[in-house]
Design a protein with these regions (language model features):
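Short active-site oxyanion
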Residues: 1, 95, 99-105
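Short amphipathic alpha-helix that is part of the acyltransferase structural core
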Residues: 1-30, 46-53, 144-156
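Conserved acetyl-CoA-binding loop-helix of GNAT-fold acetyltransferases
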Residues: 77, 83-96, 108
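Short alpha-helical functional segments enriched in proximate histidine and acidic residues
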Residues: 20, 97, 114
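Conserved active-site alpha-helix within GNAT-family acetyltransferase domains
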Residues: 100-104, 110-134
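Short loop/turn motifs at secondary-structure junctions and domain boundaries
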Residues: 35-40
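Non-DNA-binding regulatory cores of transcription-related proteins
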Residues: 123-137, 144-149, 153-156
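Conserved beta-strand in the GNAT
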Residues: 46, 52-62, 68-76
């Protein structure tokens, strides 16, 4: 079962993150960018089996040149449930709930070979305040306007 994240889920999600990503997560640019921020729980989701959270997808508010967007991450699934489509379900359900009238784009730091199935692309016109390999910055425009996104990605 998938539902919106609640504030009370935070400790369980952080424990799942620790179990899935391990101590190496602290060195990842995506972790460093998000570490002092609170997720936007309106769009963040959790996947339950029984009363246990076995998957989570989080979104954080961001903007590029005053255009509102969301940064996706992390997308995590308990190791014992990998390969069962839970990550794909979390991606599809969470993205379908995003209001494209107020959210213009979604960005993430990740692997194009996985996220391209959700129409994410590399965007070489945007960057973070810290060093992130350009081919890892993935972008999905939500509005069909002729907006071109370029510049610094600011998280808040």
């Amino acid at each position: 079962m998938i539902r919106e994240e609640k504030k009370s889920d935070n400790k369980k999600i952080l424990l799942l993150e620790e179990n899935v990503l391990g101590p190496g997560r602290y060195a990842r640019p995506s972790f460093r960018l998000r570490e002092s921020l609170k997720p936007n729980i309106k769009y963040s989701k959790v996947y339950f089996k029984g009363n246990k959270i076995i998957g989570s997808i989080r979104y954080f508010n961001c903007r590029i040149n005053n255009q509102s967007g969301l940064m996706l991450g992390p997308l995590i699934v308990d190791q014992s449930f990998k390969g069962k489509g839970i990550g794909r379900e979390l991606m599809n359900q969470s993205m379908s709930s995003i209001n494209s009238n107020s959210i213009n784009f979604i960005i993430l730091i990740g692997e194009l070979n996985y996220y391209s199935q959700f129409n994410f692309e590399v965007n070489t016109n945007i960057y973070f305040a810290i060093n992130v390999r350009q081919e890892k910055i993935l972008f999905k425009k939500l509005l069909d306007k002729n907006n071109t996104f370029f510049g610094k990605i600011e998280l808040y």
